[in-house]
């Protein structure tokens, strides 16, 4: 009994596990079986690859998911959500890049696909009581009448994925289980090896799911025409290079600028960082040193808000925020502008706060929700 759950009443509960072909979902299915649930797997295909493309991991992932389900003795269903993904995730992704922002499609995939389309299919077609995913996050299990389940950080602080799940409501959390959120990653791999699961040593997937191991610039260039332009220094406005497209760059970026070795106006040879984008002139603005003043922000404005309890914030409140994944918590104050927009003031200035990314708020272990960063302050 690896997880802290009462197993006495689980045998009548059906759980559909999102089987990705990775180690986390594999161990999630195993743990749920150990807890006595009726477990079935569901493999999602969210992206249609060209047959000509070298990158084609979906077939491999499906084979691994099937092998794990066979080993565990559970049925694996498959579903194609490629159309939903294109309409609700990928088109937004392209629109944001076209607007010079840096979106996070994984958050939108969780919102529109894994905890909406997947949940609806599991509910209506497979008659599930719960769905389960291999995310490193936890949820509370209410004990008092009227109490609602909360989204909590995962036990493994290095792998905690609550940042990607801030859009979930109490109702979605109530229908979801996160077995590996109670464990640290090495323990998950150990269980997979112990159970002789084919995914035990499989490398974690990295990057954006539909791009995989391909070069980001090549992939994006297929869908959005690149517009080369000048690279200017923030301090003197001096042209020191050319970029291949603003969409390929993000605030705080140091690598891939191809302007190394050039001294700034102060004669220093410090590394150059992207500190801003001038969309009107199609100019990439760079400064020297990661502490360049143009990289720093005292706060942000966020919109497209998703609070876990679905109630807008009406009064000023203090909490902590992350403006990117795996960032240390930043103490801050939230000031409501209206129901759709908030101003956030950091206790200390922060670097590389990036429009298009998500600001996610916490009260200790509890994820409160978040929104999309519209602008830096």
From Swiss-Prot:
Q: Name one GO biological process term.
A: tRNA wobble position uridine thiolation
One GO location term (cellular component): cytoplasm
Query: Which InterPro entries did the record assign?
Result: MnmA-like, MnmA-like_C, MnmA-like_central, MnmA-like_central_sf, Rossmann-like_a/b/a_fold
Query: Pfam families under this entry?
Result: tRNA_Me_trans (PF03054), tRNA_Me_trans_C (PF20258), tRNA_Me_trans_M (PF20259)
Positions with a binding annotation for ATP: 18-25, 44, 134
Supply the CDD domains for this chain. MnmA_TRMU-like (cd01998)
Task: Work out whether the entry's keyword set contains Transport.
Answer: no
- GO terms for MF: ATP binding; tRNA binding; tRNA-uridine 2-sulfurtransferase activity
Question: What is the reaction catalyzed?
Answer: S-sulfanyl-L-cysteinyl-[protein] + uridine(34) in tRNA + AH2 + ATP = 2-thiouridine(34) in tRNA + L-cysteinyl-[protein] + A + AMP + diphosphate + H(+)
Q: Which residues form the active site?
A: 109, 209
- Name the site position(s) for Interaction with tRNA: 135, 357
Instruction: Please classify the protein's predominant subcellular localization into one broad category.
Output: cytoplasm
Disulfide bonds, which pairs? Answer: 109-209
Where is this gene product found?
Cytoplasm
- Does the entry feature the keyword RNA-binding, yes or no? yes
Give the E.C. number(s).
2.8.1.13
Q: What is the stated purpose of this protein?
A: Catalyzes the 2-thiolation of uridine at the wobble position (U34) of tRNA, leading to the formation of s(2)U34.
Q: Which NCBIfam families match?
A: PRK00143.1, trmU
Family named by the database record: Belongs to the MnmA/TRMU family.
Q: What is this protein called?
A: tRNA-specific 2-thiouridylase MnmA
